[in-house]
């Protein structure tokens, strides 16, 4: 009976996680989040059962040695922890997906009260403890056990869903997350590596960089590449900027349709699904070359599944779980008892996948075009500047942006060394840029600059500076010129880029973004807290 009661209460305690894993997902969540893997389901089911078992053993030992006061305190905490399911109301679960107005109303009403629920638990425990000390404890234990038995049928619901998902586990690992390397022919033509670092800000990285921040790899690259001091992105949000960059035309998001986006061309004002729009990968494959993509945020693999020889997409944030069993257990326990660090851990995991698991694979497989979309230096802050390594426990202050920039610099260094080790550094065209600048830079120094880095290293490794304004929207056409062997040297690249700058800002960008609402923010239909990137 003891195990059943505690099993029921622990199961209820983890209701927010059950809802997160099994709740009906919105179109937006489906688009932004990879399908959970089997490990996540095993992790949650095992965590609830093992924690219940451990608590039961603990309680049995307390009763065995007749520690009445400890038993009372134990039941106080167990009873008070039932406040946690209130947090369920903050989650966009099935019932709220059917009634969006209720979802937004509940979130707006509870966000100021529910968030510090752990503090509320402590207050309730303190008050209850005082009352119980003055009265008998038998009634407390009786009521808690009665409530546990009343809620026990929910175990059947949660674990019934769990076993149902595991039974149909074949659909959990799909092309939504990964497209495995195909049998590709050896490509001996031009090779382009395109790196996008999310929210990298030109002004703060180069013009106004703090004196104590050293970025040796970026500074070194600046001396052997084409360097633009006035490059502007096509949009100010990842959800629109990346489709614009990959298609070579400015787009705004109309809506999210499960695994795809409906986009509007801001020049022709026509609407199309992202998968149907011409993109750099399709054009490169039409030239007979090969393509690879590894990136976070967007639902790349289903969108470009016929245009890529290799694809690995990574979670956009809070809805995701770690791919390993123990990693998922850590995420679940951390969120329940300490802090919700899923976003930080997702970012760290993303970098691990890109830099240590996918980098060698994409380079060694000799792809003609490799596209990498890194989550840093976008928040959350995940780099410990003192210890020089990633950590999910970094102080949330604007100054920590530069910690993430140190991580960017390390990644560029690792990328260079990998290319050099494979004999590709002096044979490849390397493009480093960003989808947008740091939107919250005003929190750091009260300034906002829309410029992003735009660095192009040609095979000959010559340094040149372009000071004329240019839109990074030209990147797609530039890559095609390289793949066609019409551009192969730094001089040819500079000449082509300067020619493109003559049309700026026609069809490339509007400065500032506020001149056009659709270029300022994603569609109002989207939840801004989850859609922005």
Protein language model regions, located:
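Catalytic domains that recognize anionic headgroups
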Residues: 1-533
